[in-house]
Amino acid sequence: AHLDGWEPFPRYEGPHKTHALDLSRTATHVYLSHHHEDHFDPQTLREIGPKPIIMGAFRHTGFRQQARALASRLIEIENGQCYTLGKMRIRIHAETPSYRTNSVLEIDTPCGKIVNANDCGLDASVLQDIAARGKVALFFSTLNVLANGWPFPYLRQNESDYAVRVAAVREQVREAFALGMKILKPTVSVAFAGPVSFLHPLSAHL
């Protein structure tokens, strides 16, 4: 569901996408972290074919209906509840308040614990609960230091507080990632660099 992005960005086409789709077709299940289009792309899901979809039991009725229509089976996991899938144990931690659809995925595998925070806000108490259940081998989370998400599409460079607001959000992003590493103490941390590369013209204003 990650293979296509927001519509203003260049379409992801060509051999790299073909290869990614071929790999995706071998997957047994699909995890949907949240409703944003760079994580939930219905066309991509149609292209890889119906598969069991795993997601949180969100309040967003439209999201759930869309996922159900695309899945061979929809598996909705209540917040923090354990779901067994083969040799793995899965937990989904939904972001609060409950109207949000963001989620953190915690997977216990025979090879170690994986935590994928996606774009979700990190809650210290949730991270502490995860850490208490065992050593984290891999921690994935966003580190969009370009800060090209909200509120920056609504700002102009000539605004007097532009630089201050950009710097504040960038610092929040760094602090959140550092908090995750501090609490989880993972063997390896992997940062998502954000939806647009630094040299892309869409980031020129930064």
Summary of predicted features, one role per range:
Residues R11-G14, S98, C120, V169-R174:
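A conditional alpha-helix N-cap/helix-loop micro-motif detector
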Residues K51-G112:
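Metallo-beta-lactamase
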Residues A1-Y31, P42-E47, L122-K135:
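Pre-active-site segment of Zn-dependent metallo-hydrolases
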Residues H2-F9, H93-I114, C120-S125, A131-G134, ...:
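Active-site-proximal loop/helix segment associated with metal-binding centers of metalloenzymes
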Residues H35-F40, T61-R64, Q81-T84, S98-T101, ...:
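Active-site environment of divalent metal-dependent phosphoester hydrolases
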Residues A124-L206:
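Cap/insert and terminal regions of metallo-dependent hydrolase folds
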Residues D41-P50, P201-H205:
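Metal-dependent catalytic neighborhoods of phosphoester/phosphodiester hydrolases
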Residues A1, T26-F40, I54-F58, V115-C120, ...:
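Active-site neighborhood of phospho(di)ester-bond hydrolases with catalytic His/Asp-centered motifs
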